[in-house]
């Protein structure tokens, strides 16, 4: 070991340790592991590898409780992305990941590099990306920063995804004051690969070359992982240098070059450089394979002059990959990457030492054991307290607003208003396989690799539900994803989760995380809908104010006959409208935590609607059978805003009115209640009796509630808003707001 590593040039003071995000106890553990004081390079490596962002030290105890297996799961959590068997020798490979903290500081680049990073996670596994989705949460529209953040984030997502040539096909957007200081940007990519051509990240083969490919390394993103592991304060704007800068054109070249190399037998292991850059990719690959690595940092392609080993190890420059190649394949691989005008450098060798030895022009500048920084990194069992049960919602005044007025207000409120202004900035049709565009329950794409087969995908979470009851909210997020896939006729197969929460050092916040994990686990088990990948983003707080807990669920399902899928749009006049699924209570009206309660009565209170998972599955399986049997002409799950908002969305999508005929007085609870596990269906009048009989035989609640036709919504003879009036209100809020 050289003098530079054993006697640090920079004395490691308590201040420097704190600046690196390590606690006193963690630094004491570093000293015990190293048997000496680390130098600055080594301290920086411990800092990022033990950060919450990389180590999951507060969350992994609970993530281990999630169900991750099923006969169709090929690879669950622990790799770059999850892999599921979709039949015909094909797999779907997918993951969702957050880029929350960078997107608040520098919205365009933060969101753009979030897309770039999740694309790399998927094509690293050997898949060609076929679809992107995003789940976005912004602050109150009245907050002065919200408009700026929406503009930058949407432009960043579109700018990157459009240039790479992968369609952005769906997602969701919510607004709430709790996100004023921490917006959420959760990006999801789905790819398709042959089942016999999947690539993994475990390094193997003593003496094999460790190869760097892609863009050169600059100073952008240094300590990005550490920044994403701390609360924000008033000076967070000063963290702009820690936001990475993306180049989608280079990413496109990198995708094509990697996929071309994957058609040879050259690759032993491959890993993208994401959070913590070269450090994380090296340590993870070596740890998974039980290897050591000798790394010559002076061989790393550099974008800027005078870069130091510390900067090279911690940079989060984008569009970079690390590979282990088979002996003798280096020259062929170099020629391939040079053809694509990408950097290629052999920067290291695999060893059997179990250590990471870093050199700079032949001098050792770092020597660390691998496992304590990766597989054996810290794991905390943080104190947590359950969320108190919410008091019953005050429903006084619920009948004071006529349903027609309430509907117009809800259909134009920020959480329901059309997202057209957003998704029209995304190329959702590139590749030519998008069957259902944004705006429905789930996106549907055809697969070139298997004519007739399709994939459906969705993102879902209702943060206000999770805040009121994390267990029920976690269940509901999974159930709604399952329901949205079912509503287009897909067979739900698996999920990826993106767990966005506040400071886990606070027992109340940690309790939200634990509760959500419990709810997600219950729902996944009941619905045969395992977790195959995911991401955790904690410390989403500013000045001590936490976000609403947001465990976003990305769901993927398969359609063996993609032409059998249905959309939400009403198709023809004279068809029967039916509701599948029952109400929770005898009144048939769950208004606790509903949009109606918040937007019309101005109250956020009560418990969220409970989820009956057995009923959810029974009703969903029945509805899917109807769709695949060609009995259903349109289908929409009932969620935000309940029955009447769902019907209005179907009417606008099909440019056709509808009339509801309900038993008794149609009170606002029945019209806008958010009872779970329900679908709104239309069937041809000639099929109505057969469908009702089939439901009765299956023991599934199903009620005929109306008929399609006309140019307005009518309830029990009372003529409400026209479809044109609904569309005007629905479409105008977001463009008007963004015009400022």
From Swiss-Prot:
Residues the record lists as binding Mg(2+) 1: 97, 535
Keywords of the record: ATP-binding, Cytoplasm, Ligase, Magnesium, Metal-binding, Nucleotide-binding, Purine biosynthesis
GO BP term (any one): 'de novo' IMP biosynthetic process
Keyword Signal: no
Major localization class: cytoplasm
Entry annotated with the keyword ATP-binding: yes
Leader sequence residues: none
UniProt enzyme class: ligase
EC number from the UniProt entry: 6.3.5.3
Residues binding substrate: 98-101, 120, 244, 316-318, 537
Subunit structure as annotated in this protein's UniProt entry: Monomer. Part of the FGAM synthase complex composed of 1 PurL, 1 PurQ and 2 PurS subunits.
Protein family: Belongs to the FGAMS family.
HAMAP family associated with the record: PurL_2
Protein name according to UniProt: Phosphoribosylformylglycinamidine synthase subunit PurL
Organism (species): Rhodospirillum rubrum (strain ATCC 11170 / ATH 1.1.1 / DSM 467 / LMG 4362 / NCIMB 8255 / S1)
């Amino acid at each position: 070991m050289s003098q530079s590593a054993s006697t640090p040039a920079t004395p490691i003071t308590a201040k420097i340790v704190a600046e690196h995000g390590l606690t006193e106890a963690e630094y004491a553990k570093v000293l015990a592991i190293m048997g000496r004081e680390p130098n600055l390079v080594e301290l920086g490596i411990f800092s990022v590898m033990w950060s919450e962002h990389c180590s999951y030290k507060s969350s992994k105890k609970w993530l281990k409780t999630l169900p991750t297996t099923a006969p169709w799961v090929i690879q669950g959590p622990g790799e770059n992305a999850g892999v599921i068997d979709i039949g015909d020798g094909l797999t779907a490979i997918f993951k969702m990941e957050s880029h929350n903290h960078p997107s608040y500081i520098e919205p365009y680049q933060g969101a753009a590099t979030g897309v770039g990073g999740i694309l790399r996670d998927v094509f690293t596994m050997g898949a060609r990306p076929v679809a992107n989705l995003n789940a976005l949460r912004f602050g109150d529209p009245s907050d002065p920063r919200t408009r700026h953040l929406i503009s930058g984030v949407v432009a960043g997502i579109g700018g990157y995804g459009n240039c790479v040539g992968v369609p952005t096909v769906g997602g969701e957007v919510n607004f709430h004051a709790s996100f004023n200081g921490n917006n959420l940007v959760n990006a999801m990519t789905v790819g398709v690969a042959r089942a016999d051509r999947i690539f993994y990240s475990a390094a193997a083969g003593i003496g094999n070359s460790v190869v760097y490919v892609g863009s050169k390394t600059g100073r952008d993103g240094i300590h990005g992982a550490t920044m994403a592991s701390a609360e924000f304060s008033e000076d967070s704007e000063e963290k702009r240098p820690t936001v990475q800068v993306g180049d989608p054109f280079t990413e496109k070249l990198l995708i094509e070059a990697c996929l071309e190399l994957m058609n040879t037998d050259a690759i032993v292991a491959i890993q993208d450089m994401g959070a913590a850059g070269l450090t994380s990719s090296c340590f993870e690959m070596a740890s998974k394979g039980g290897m050591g690595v000798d790394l010559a940092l002076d061989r790393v392609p550099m974008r800027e002059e005078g870069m130091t080993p510390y900067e090279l190890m911690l940079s989060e420059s984008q569009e970079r990959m690390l590979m282990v190649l088979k002996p003798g394949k280096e020259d062929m691989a170099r020629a391939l990457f040079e053809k694509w005008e990408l950097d290629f450098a052999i920067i290291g060798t695999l060893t059997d030492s179990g250590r990471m030895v870093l050199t700079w022009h032949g001098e050792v500048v770092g020597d660390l054991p691998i496992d304590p920084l990766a597989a054996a990194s810290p794991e905390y069992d943080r104190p947590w307290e359950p969320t108190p049960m919410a008091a019953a919602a005050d429903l006084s005044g619920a009948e004071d607003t006529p349903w027609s007025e309430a509907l117009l207000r809800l259909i134009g409120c920020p959480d329901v208003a059309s997202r057209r202004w957003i998704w029209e900035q995304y190329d959702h049709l590139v590749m030519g396989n998008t069957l259902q565009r944004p705006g429905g329950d789930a996106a549907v794409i055809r697969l070139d690799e298997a004519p007739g087969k399709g994939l459906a995908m969705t993102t879902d979470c209702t943060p206000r539900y999770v805040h009121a009851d994390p267990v029920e909210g976690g269940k509901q997020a999974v159930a709604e994803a399952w329901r949205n896939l079912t509503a287009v006729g897909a067979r739900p197969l698996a999920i990826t989760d993106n767990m966005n929460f506040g400071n886990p050092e606070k027992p109340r916040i940690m309790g939200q995380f634990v509760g959500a994990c419990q709810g997600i686990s219950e729902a996944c088990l009941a619905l045969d809908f395992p977790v195959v990948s995911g991401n955790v983003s904690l410390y989403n707080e500013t000045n001590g104010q936490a976000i609403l807990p947001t465990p976003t669920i990305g769901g993927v399902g398969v359609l063996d006959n993609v032409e059998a899928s249905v959309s939400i749009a009403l198709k023809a006049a004279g068809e029967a409208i039916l509701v599948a699924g029952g109400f929770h209570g005898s009144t048939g009206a769950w208004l606790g935590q509903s949009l109606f309660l918040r937007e019309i009565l101005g109250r956020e209170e009560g418990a969220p609607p409970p989820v009956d998972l057995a009923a959810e599955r029974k009703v969903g399986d029945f509805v899917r059978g109807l769709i695949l049997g060609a009995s259903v002409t349109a289908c929409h799950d009932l969620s935000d805003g309940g029955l009447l908002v769902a019907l209005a969305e179907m009417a606008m999508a099909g440019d056709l009115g509808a009339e509801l005929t309900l038993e008794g007085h149609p009170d606002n609870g029945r019209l806008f209640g958010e009872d779970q596990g329900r679908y709104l269906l239309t069937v041809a009048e000639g099929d109505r009796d057969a469908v009702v009989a089939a439901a009765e035989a299956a023991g599934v609640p199903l009620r005929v509630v109306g008929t399609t036709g006309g140019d307005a919504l009518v309830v029990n003879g009372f003529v409400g808003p026209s479809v044109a009036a609904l569309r005007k209100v629905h479409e105008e809020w977001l463009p008007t707001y963004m015009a400022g």
